[in-house]
Amino acid sequence: MDPTKNVKCVAVMKNLSCFVGYDSKEDIAYRVCKHSLLKRASMDIKIFSLKLDELVAKKFYNREIDPLASTQFTYSRFLVPTLMNYKGWAIFCDCDFIFLDDIAKITENLDESKAVYCVKHDYTPKDRKSVV
């Protein structure tokens, strides 16, 4: 019996696209996130900031501003598959992430049968009407 027979891991990735949610009120957080990602990456990575004004200008985003949205990228994070032309793997993270290890490690056990991986965290909205 071959224990690897049913394993569906992706071949070793050479590059990765990383989309970071950008909020103009958190520019420094974005810069720290980007720096920590680049500093520790052992693979080629392309980092894209999801800046709302740029997405609107390129006609990728035309939603009304939601006063209950907690960040400028509350909804634009869901554009990542479209921005990737529905091909390959990409990572999205909020701008307040600090990478303490190599991002390449996250790609080691990807399974081609999965369309999305996500991390759920405990969050209680301050306002019951919040979209988060």
Each model region followed by its residue ranges:
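Glycosyltransferase catalytic domains, chiefly GT-A lineage
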Residues: 9-132
